[in-house]
A protein has these predicted regions:
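PLP-dependent amino-acid enzyme catalytic core
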Residues: 1-271
């Protein structure tokens, strides 16, 4: 209320965020939304969900490249004062539905408190018991929300970072070296097909502060990798561990759960 400009929401998606954002913002006054997705990097269902989206204020664009390429360009747009000034003249301002906007992460923090309360309600734990949380992730957003929940006092022992064949986060959590100079894999869990995990920067900021994080991000941009110091890795290891799996094991897990529980889990949950 009181804002005369129109919000232009830019969304880079590896699959799931795009449809959710389009549906959430369709036909809302003073909002326009543009979603960009990798042309060959989402499932057919995800592509159709976005391409057939109804709404007078929505736009969807397939990009030749992967999610990292798109996310980097969206960040460049946000950091460009020239683009911001030009949009201002036209009556627009930029916003995002990605986790580049912390407003995306804030509601996710609630998931973990709700889950803990459910475990208490079902008498599976008692108040104060610590739990382990396993999150399939590529961009490190939802698992960072779990970490914030832990900082807020939720009794979480270990945050388990589950990766697919693009296992850059697993390598980082085990070695402290983040190296995106590697092969990019298109997998059956496309929402996790990411090599530049933008929310990891936030974790490093929480643990090591602005100056060290800025140095590491500069190295990532210039050289494609960085190595954190031993103290930082030790501190991260107090809360996180990382594991990865391949396509074969992911499919086996889907089959096992369907056979044992008559429940079809999706490919990301299977990771």
């Amino acid at each position: 209320e009181g804002e005369s400009r129109t919000a232009l929401i830019l969304v880079a998606t590896s699959g799931d965020t795009g449809k959710a954002a389009l549906e959430g913002y369709k036909n809302i006054d003073q909002i326009k939304i543009s979603v960009f997705y990798p042309k060959n990097g989402v499932s057919t269902i995800q592509q159709l969900q976005m391409a057939t989206q109804e709404g007078e204020n929505v736009n969807v664009c397939a990009v030749n490249g992967n999610f990292d390429d798109i996310q980097s360009e969206v960040k460049n747009i946000f950091s460009s004062s020239d683009i911001s000034s030009k949009l201002e003249e036209m009556g627009y301002f930029l916003s995002s539905a990605n986790s580049i906007n912390f407003g995306r992460l804030a509601p996710q923090i609630v998931y973990y408190f709700k889950s803990y309360c459910d475990l208490l309600k079902n008498r599976e734990i008692t108040l104060g018991d610590k739990i382990n949380v396993c999150v399939p992730t590529g961009n490190f957003g939802n698992i960072l929300a779990a970490y914030v929940a832990k900082l807020m006092g939720l009794p979480i022992a270990t945050l388990i970072c589950a990766s697919n064949s693009n296992n850059i986060l697993t390598d980082f959590l085990n070695t402290g070296r983040y190296d995106r100079n590697r092969e990019f894999h298109l997998t059956i869990s496309p929402s996790m097909d990411i090599l530049i995990s933008s929310n990891l920067e936030r974790l490093l900021y929480f643990i090591s502060g602005a100056d060290a994080t800025a140095t590491w991000m500069k190295s990532l941009n210039q050289n494609g990798y960085y190595q954190v110091d031993e103290n930082t890795l030790t501190e991260i290891s107090k809360s996180f561990c990382g594991y990865c799996t391949d396509e074969t094991q992911t499919k086996k897990t889907i089959g096992k759960y369907f056979h044992d529980y008559n429940y079809l889990i999706d490919t990301h949950t299977a990771v």
